[in-house]
Amino acid sequence: MSMSDPIADLLTRIRNAQMVSKATVSVPSSKVKVAIAQVLKDEGYIDGFEVKSESGKTELEITLKYYAGRPVIERIERVSRPGLRVYKGCGSIPQVMNGLGVAIVTTPKGVMTDRKARATGVGGEVLCYVA
């Protein structure tokens, strides 16, 4: 059975793994998921990630990050979904927690944070909020 929203599945797996203090979480890999993991790593929300290939299936293994025993990611939620896509221009990309969190946006120039999208002057689909 095919998955209707693989990005929501990625975010849910990260959220669930952090609630039970897992060190790593493994999800089926795709180019967009790897790009999201790269943004999370660059912003300091995860320790790292690795793409592993086993018998024709590629898995994305994400190493989660904790501070003083608590997850670094307090909130991670999907914004644009298959039933309701959310597109924003560069001037209307929302700030998350007044700039303390990030919105991950997919643009014609790649997957990036809300700050980088505003600085680059491009808009796109708002994938998720992370705080």
Curated annotation (Swiss-Prot):
Check the record and name the NCBIfam families matching this protein: PRK00136.1
Q: Does the keyword Repeat apply?
A: no
State the name under which the record lists this protein.
Small ribosomal subunit protein uS8
Q: Which UniProt keywords apply?
A: Ribonucleoprotein, Ribosomal protein, RNA-binding, rRNA-binding
- Pfam families xrefs: Ribosomal_S8
What the record says about family reads: Belongs to the universal ribosomal protein uS8 family.
Q: What is the lineage of its organism?
A: Bacteria, Pseudomonadati, Pseudomonadota, Betaproteobacteria, Burkholderiales
| Gene that specifies this protein | rpsH
One MF term in the entry's GO annotations:
rRNA binding
Q: Which InterPro entries match?
A: Ribosomal_uS8, Ribosomal_uS8_CS, Ribosomal_uS8_sf
Gene Ontology biological process terms in this record:
translation
Taken from the UniProt entry, a GO cellular component term is: ribonucleoprotein complex
Q: How does it assemble?
A: Part of the 30S ribosomal subunit. Contacts proteins S5 and S12.
Carries keyword Mitochondrion? no
The task this protein performs is described as: One of the primary rRNA binding proteins, it binds directly to 16S rRNA central domain where it helps coordinate assembly of the platform of the 30S subunit.
Q: Which PROSITE patterns match?
A: RIBOSOMAL_S8
